[in-house]
Amino acid sequence: MATVSTNEFKGGLKIMLDNEPCVILENEYVKPGKGQAFNRVRIRKLLTGKVLEKTFKSGDTAEVADVVDIDLDYLYNDGEFYHFMNNSTFEQLAADAKAVGENAKWLVENNTCMLTLWNGNPIAVTPPNFVELEVTETDPGVKGDTQGTGGKPATLSTGAVVRVPLFVQIGEVIKVDTRSAEYVGRVK
């Protein structure tokens, strides 16, 4: 199995830690005035989603995780599994709710998502960075109400709740950033 040294650590690198695939979120190289240099690393375990901090001595090595990232189109949810399809081979994969996690509210049919596979099984689903969803429920925007420019909450067609500007009405389609759950703009 391939190994990677601590001086090659960077955000997004997938490594094995305690026989479990993990992704490096942040890597900080620390060189104290006295003693050996080390790397302080924030890691997210891909199976559980748990984030932890670990310290590696300078020169340590870690095994590269044997995970594959593939782009698949989201098809549907049958209540137990979320189904995805490869557009070139038409092969279908089913991911359980644990693999999808909080990202279920951003899954829109026929949108391309990135699935992380480990031993052929999906362990993580990443939706596209931006999705277009219809506003199904929100308070009406009253003309002249400019006090408190924080906006108002709006429920979208997938059940996600996002803060939107006062002018957004029910039935409009808006663009949302899935990484921060923020309103980006209206879709024309």
Swiss-Prot record:
One of its GO terms (biological process) is peptide biosynthetic process. Pathway: Protein biosynthesis; polypeptide chain elongation. May be beta-lysylated on the epsilon-amino group of Lys-34 by the combined action of EpmA and EpmB, and then hydroxylated on the C5 position of the same residue by EpmC (if this protein is present). Lysylation is critical for the stimulatory effect of EF-P on peptide-bond formation. The lysylation moiety may extend toward the peptidyltransferase center and stabilize the terminal 3-CCA end of the tRNA. Hydroxylation of the C5 position on Lys-34 may allow additional potential stabilizing hydrogen-bond interactions with the P-tRNA. Transmembrane segments: none annotated. PROSITE patterns: EFP. The keyword Cytoplasm applies. The gene is efp. This is Elongation factor P. Belongs to the elongation factor P family. Involved in peptide bond synthesis. Alleviates ribosome stalling that occurs when 3 or more consecutive Pro residues or the sequence PPG is present in a protein, possibly by augmenting the peptidyl transferase activity of the ribosome. Modification of Lys-34 is required for alleviation. It is found in: Cytoplasm. SMART domains: EFP, Elong-fact-P_C. The modification N6-(3,6-diaminohexanoyl)-5-hydroxylysine is found at residue 34. Keywords: Cytoplasm, Elongation factor, Hydroxylation, Protein biosynthesis. It comes from Vibrio cholerae serotype O1 (strain ATCC 39315 / El Tor Inaba N16961). GO terms for molecular function: translation elongation factor activity.
